Structure formats: structure tokens, C-alpha cells
UniProtKB/Swiss-Prot annotation:
It holds the Pfam family Cytochrome_B. This is Cytochrome b. Keywords: Electron transport, Heme, Iron, Membrane, Metal-binding, Mitochondrion, Mitochondrion inner membrane, Respiratory chain, Transmembrane, Transmembrane helix, Transport, Ubiquinone. The cytochrome bc1 complex contains 11 subunits: 3 respiratory subunits (MT-CYB, CYC1 and UQCRFS1), 2 core proteins (UQCRC1 and UQCRC2) and 6 low-molecular weight proteins (UQCRH/QCR6, UQCRB/QCR7, UQCRQ/QCR8, UQCR10/QCR9, UQCR11/QCR10 and a cleavage product of UQCRFS1). This cytochrome bc1 complex then forms a dimer. GO terms for molecular function: metal ion binding; ubiquinol-cytochrome-c reductase activity. Gene3D superfamilies: Cytochrome Bc1 Complex, Chain C. GO terms for cellular component: mitochondrial inner membrane; respiratory chain complex III. It comes from Scolomys juruaense (Ucayali spiny mouse). GO terms for biological process: mitochondrial electron transport, ubiquinol to cytochrome c. Heme 1 (or BL or b562) is low-potential and absorbs at about 562 nm, and heme 2 (or BH or b566) is high-potential and absorbs at about 566 nm. Heme b b562 binds at residues 83, 182.
């Protein structure tokens, strides 16, 4: 008689995805971040549901409802801070996951990579609309500035912005629809995650060597379930340390001031995980140019499979491209720092140089380095 998990129509799917899944025997801890993202998504949905039970999406009561959650709801402060800092952990895992994909050549699994980019954009949209909900100063002005960028679109821009706002400024209608989007998007993300995994399991996982690993695979359970559990415990330790000791370290103090349309904060800036894109946006003096650069800073990921000129899979044995990769990562940190700085000398110049370098490395230097490496290694196959 067949084991139930192998014959039952529903359990069979779970079995093929999480238990008997053939997995390369040599994948490192960089492969843990996929499962960590799954855990982050679960944490965010659960805490988000509990917050939604007490939150009111009305401009007059939104700020007080968040205060009420923190002061009067049992462990409301804990749920709120897990949700706020959980978003930061989510993006840390997301950046590492994408970075690992670039380093080990996972971009060549086209469908998985493209769904991943859609997931990245959807997660960014979710985080943006979520940041507006507490209706503090930075929530209000962040929403105003970022939605206003759409007015740079020729001909339809202004109409589009007013349509998104539901009026002539960010107001009650905007907050209500943003709450709706913030509620529904995580479930859309969950559906996209399943599609992401479906495509991944069609081809099988990549591995650090970049070679075909079909000859040496092991079952996912118990080997990688145990390995993932260690990662999950470390993630929870980091998250709870952040929540219980430094809950506001990644937030903005201005968001503890209720939204006031008549008073603009000194420095309007988004959450830390958007700062790199915000720095690229600000580095271009033209409004439409800035918006296009902002979009391209994320959509350039879709060009990775097209720009790949190497005969090898991944950067494991490619020292020139490896050096460029780490310069690119360092440059991302610089952009993140610049995004949080005021618009003045020397930050403007540093931001512009970093933005140029960001695109130059991806579009010109990495493909050139790959071609040089092919020639040096005589890879003309």
C-alpha cells in the first residue's frame, strides 16, 4: 500500500514540494532565504489581520486607532512592532535572496526570475501603501510625494494622480483605498509565491557550483527542513531583538506626529528599504527622467538574463565579475545612505555618481567582464 502523503491528491502536492523534493546536496545557507521569506510573509499576514481588527481607515481616527492598539489592546504594541519591523526583516531577506540569485546565476531560470521580479514590485507596493496607514506626518507626505510622481507622465499624469487620490489631495478617500490595497496585496503575493515555486520545481534548484546537480540530489526532508529551522530561529531571534529592544530604530520620529497638510517635515523620506531607489530618483534633476530611473532601478533586474554573456553559470569561478558584483553591493549601501540625507552638497554629487555606477555596472561592465573571462578561459563553446 502506498504511503498516504504520496497518494492523497492534496498531500501529494505538499509532498512533492516540501518532503520528497529532490534538492542539490551542496546548496549553502544563502538558499535559506526563500523559506525565511515564506515565514516573514506568514508573520506579516497574521499580525496584519490582528491589526486590521482594531484599525480604522478614516483620516480623523486612523492615528488614534494605532495609538489605541499600542495602549489598550492586549499585546497590541507587540503585534504592531512585529508587523512594522517584520517588514524590515522581509526586505532584508528579499535583498539577500535577489543578491544570491544574481551571484549564482539563478537569473537564467527565466520564468522563476520574472515571477520573482513581479513579487518584488508587489511587495514594494504593499509596503508603500502600508506605510501610509498610521497617518503620521511621514505617512501623509510620503504618500503625497510618491503618488505625485505619476503626474510626470505626459498628457494623462494629472488625471491619473487625482484618480488615485480620489480627490484633489491625499485625503480620506486615499487612506481608505490604500488600506484596501494593503489588505488584499499580501494574498496576491501568496498566490504569486505558489507560481514562483511551481516554476522553480519545474527546473529544480540551482546550486553554488553552477553545474548540473541531477546526479547528486537528496530529499528536502529531513536535511533541508532542519537547515531551514535553524534559519527561522535566527530570523526570529533577530526580529524579536529588534522588536523588544529597538522597536523604533528603523522608523521615522516624524511619524509620531499626526498628519498635518499645512506643515511639511524638514526631510521627506521613505522607509530605509526604498532609500536606494529614492536616491536614484532624486539624482536626476528632471521629474520624468527621475521617475523613469526609479522604475528602471528595479526593472533592470529583468535585463539580467539578456545581458548575460558568460559561458559559465554564476560567478563562482569568475573573479573579475565577482569584484564588480561586490562594488555593486557597496554602491547599493552608498545609495541607501544618500537617500536618507538632505538634498545638499556633497550628497547630490555622491548620489549622481552612485546612480550612474549602479546602471553602468549592470549594463556595461558586467557583460564586458564576462566576455573577457570567456576569452581568458578559452570558453568559445
Amino acid at each position: 500500500m502506498t504511503i498516504l502523503r504520496k497518494s492523497h491528491p492534496l498531500l501529494k502536492i505538499i509532498n512533492h514540494s516540501l518532503i520528497d523534493l529532490p534538492t542539490p546536496s551542496n546548496i549553502s545557507s544563502w538558499w535559506n532565504f526563500g523559506s525565511l521569506l515564506g515565514i516573514c510573509l506568514m508573520i506579516q499576514i497574521i499580525t496584519g489581520l490582528f491589526l486590521a481588527m482594531h484599525y480604522t481607515s478614516d483620516t480623523t481616527t486612523a492615528f488614534s486607532s494605532v495609538t489605541h492598539i499600542c495602549r489598550d489592546v492586549n499585546y497590541g504594541w507587540l503585534i504592531r512592532y512585529i508587523h512594522a519591523n517584520g517588514a524590515s526583516m522581509f526586505f532584508i531577506c528579499l535583498f539577500i535572496h535577489v543578491g544570491r540569485g544574481i551571484y549564482y546565476g539563478x537569473x537564467m531560470l527565466n520564468e522563476t526570475w520574472n515571477i520573482g521580479i513581479i513579487l518584488f514590485l508587489t511587495t514594494m507596493a504593499t509596503a508603500f501603501v502600508g506605510y501610509v496607514l498610521p497617518w503620521g506626518q511621514m505617512s501623509f507626505w510620503g504618500a503625497t510625494v510618491i503618488t505625485n510622481l505619476l503626474s510626470a507622465i505626459p498628457y494623462v499624469g494629472t488625471t491619473l494622480v487625482e484618480w488615485i487620490w480620489g480627490g484633489f489631495s491625499v485625503d480620506k478617500a486615499t487612506l481608505t483605498r490604500f488600506f484596501t490595497f494593503h489588505f488584499i496585496l499580501p494574498f496576491i503575493i501568496t498566490a504569486l509565491v505558489l507560481v514562483h515555486l511551481l516554476f522553480l520545481h519545474e527546473t529544480g534548484s540551482n546550486n553554488p557550483s553552477g553545474l548540473n546537480s541531477n546526479a547528486d540530489k537528496i530529499p528536502f526532508h529531513p536535511y533541508y527542513t532542519i537547515k531551514d529551522l535553524l534559519g527561522i530561529f535566527m530570523l526570529l531571534l533577530a526580529l524579536m531583538t529588534l522588536v523588544l529592544f529597538f522597536p523604533d530604530i528603523l522608523g521615522d520620529p516624524d511619524n509620531y506626529i499626526p498628519a498635518n497638510p499645512l506643515n511639511t517635515p524638514a526631510h521627506i523620506k521613505p522607509e530605509w528599504y526604498f532609500l536606494f531607489a529614492y536616491a536614484i530618483l532624486r539624482s536626476i534633476p528632471n521629474k520624468l527622467g527621475g521617475v523613469l530611473a526609479l522604475l528602471l532601478s528595479i526593472l533592470i533586474l529583468a535585463a539580467f538574463p539578456l545581458l548575460n554573456t558568460s559561458k559559465q553559470h554564476g560567478l563562482m569561478y569568475r573573479p573579475i565579475t565577482q569584484t564588480l558584483y561586490w562594488i555593486f553591493i557597496a554602491n547599493l549601501f552608498i545609495l541607501t545612505w544618500i537617500g536618507g540625507q538632505p538634498v545638499e552638497h556633497p550628497f547630490i554629487m555622491i548620489g549622481q555618481i552612485s546612480s550612474i555606477l549602479y546602471f553602468t555596472i549592470i549594463v556595461i561592465l558586467m557583460p564586458m567582464a564576462s566576455m573577457i573571462e570567456n576569452n581568458v578561459l578559452k570558453l568559445h563553446v
